[in-house]
């Protein structure tokens, strides 16, 4: 950990290019941003600008060509992909237990923790169900709990609702947001859905077209009746203004 690190995550002058026999394609060009502890940040940008590549770099599935990614001392990342990737031959309980099993954690402590998570997030009645017996929303909740079982400090969400129908997306985004806030997790969401980004995030980072740079960062402050949720956020008086602002940035001619 760097002595001068002030944030949970810092991305400094990050650049990355794809290298093929035909040549080099610059994807990310000196990208800079940071994330605070407990913050929920969404990244939006044109299709193909390198959003998912950025997450792969943050969790070290790829290595940058230049620049640096600095995560706090002994901090861990968890990665939730577009598909839930639940193993069809394992029960809900066994799917959630996969990470800790690989890490050889105590089975007694593990069982208590999983039972608590299943109860807290309305899956206790489906402990022994196989994935094909779960709804799309239940599968996503199970996938999120599985990711949280590894106790990540930063959760990376790569369009986790994209395979769901619209009504289920609204419900599951509320579920995921509630779980992350309850567990006091820091999250970075990649999405192409402007409304989703506004409804869930404390701050939105807008990337340019490839090669991507950070065009703008927008703090999100919404007035909601009662406690904020993604669903209630969509009816806030400021929501339309934020949508228009993000839309304008994404469609502004370079």
Spans of model-derived segments:
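The feature captures the beta-strand-to-loop junction immediately N-terminal to the Walker
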Residues: 44-46
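Helix-to-loop junction immediately C-terminal to a conserved catalytic motif
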Residues: 59
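Short coil-to-helix segment of the ABC ATPase nucleotide-binding domain corresponding to the Q-loop/switch region
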Residues: 90-97
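Conserved ABC ATPase "signature" region
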Residues: 108-126, 178
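Conserved ABC ATPase signature
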Residues: 130-134, 138
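A short, proline-enriched helix->beta-strand linker immediately N-terminal to the Walker B motif
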Residues: 149-153
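Catalytic Walker B motif of ABC-type/P-loop ATPase nucleotide-binding domains
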Residues: 155-158
């Amino acid at each position: 950990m760097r002595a001068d690190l002030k944030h949970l995550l810092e991305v400094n002058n990050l650049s990355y290019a794809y290298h093929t026999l035909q040549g080099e394609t610059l994807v990310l060009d000196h990208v800079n941003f940071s994330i605070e502890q407990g913050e929920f940040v969404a990244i939006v940008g044109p299709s193909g600008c390198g959003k998912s590549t950025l997450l792969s770099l943050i969790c070290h599935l790829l290595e940058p060509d230049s620049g640096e990614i600095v995560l706090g001392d002994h901090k861990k990342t968890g990665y939730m992909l577009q598909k839930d990737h639940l193993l069809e031959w394992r029960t809900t309980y066994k799917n959630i237990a996969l990470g800790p099993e690989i890490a050889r954690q105590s089975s007694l402590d593990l069982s208590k923790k999983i039972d608590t998570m299943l109860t807290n997030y309305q899956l206790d009645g489906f402990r022994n169900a196989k994935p094909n017996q779960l709804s799309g929303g239940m599968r996503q909740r199970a996938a999120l709990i599985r990711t949280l079982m590894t106790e990540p400090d930063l959760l990376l969400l790569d369009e986790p609702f994209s395979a769901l129908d619209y009504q289920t997306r609204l419900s599951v985004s509320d579920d995921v947001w509630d779980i992350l806030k309850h567990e006091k997790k820091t999250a970075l969401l990649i999405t192409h859905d402007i409304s989703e980004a506004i409804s869930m995030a404390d701050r939105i980072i807008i990337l340019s077209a490839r090669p991507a740079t950070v065009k703008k960062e927008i703090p999100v402050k919404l007035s909601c009746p009662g406690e904020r949720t993604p669903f209630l956020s969509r009816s806030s008086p400021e929501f339309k203004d934020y949508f228009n602002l993000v839309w304008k940035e994404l469609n502004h001619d370079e």
